[in-house]
Amino acid sequence: MRKGTLLMEKMSFEIYRYNPDVDAKPYMQRYELELEPTDVKLLDALVRLKAQDDTLSFRRSCREGICGSDGMNINGKNGLACLTDLRGLKQPVKIRPLPGLPVIRDLIVDMTPFFNQYHSIKPYVVNDNPIDSDKERLQTQEERKELDGLYECILCACCSTACPSFWWNPDKFVGPSGLLNAYRFIADSRDTITNERLDNLNDPYRLFRCHTIMNCVDVCPKHLNPTRAIGKIKEIMLKRAV
């Protein structure tokens, strides 16, 4: 279709819809959208679709791949809508909520099981050693470098909701994101409760339900490696046991 002198590109979408107040079961709704030159990422298209149909529900915030709000399943693979290039997607673009979590409405999932596991690993530095109030707890450059590839996690849940072990045991298995963050504090030279952190994970489910499927690595929008972090925790546990 032409708009002025420009040929407008049209894209088709099939989006998961479910409103528990009115729908007996979920369904896929088809949408057509004539793209504007400013439609670069999938989130751009979703925002425009919502302008046409204000009942369509999804989370979004920063639009920069920082907040992690707009995680969803895009053509069968978890990702962030704001980082997903729009025009290269196979059509119709099939968009579903992140798998393995209860659906609140449309593409919005209940993140409670995910954040329960995250909070269970005490995601903060613990150090009871006294220090002068006008000083910081210092690290060498080498100690700081140990945290690279760990602290960048934005808690979007793309990795944990791509993990079959988390689907099956969300109340028992910490999940890739939680375990990546657990290792982030185990590896932190300023933290003094390493043994407590390891004891917290020394359970048939919490850590050892990872089967190195590596879906987490494949979908992480920040290109992190939870499987490697999980392996590091297991290695530390083994060294502690012998």
Question: Where would I find each of the regions flagged by the language model?
Answer:
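Short, Lys/Arg-enriched N-terminal segments with co-localized hydrophobic residues
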Residues: 1-7
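Short structural boundary motif marking the start of a folded domain
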Residues: 8-13
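Short, contiguous acidic and Ser/Thr-rich linear segments
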Residues: 29-40
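Short strand-turn-strand beta-turns centered on an Asx-Gly dipeptide
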Residues: 34, 73-77
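Ferredoxin-type iron-sulfur electron-transfer modules in oxidoreductases and energy-metabolism complexes
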Residues: 40-53, 96-242
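Active-site phosphate-binding and catalytic loops of NTP-dependent enzymes
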Residues: 53-59
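Short, structured protein-protein interaction patches enriched in aromatics and acidic/basic residues
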Residues: 62-71
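Glycine-rich phosphate/adenylate-binding loop and adjacent beta-alpha elements
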Residues: 76-96
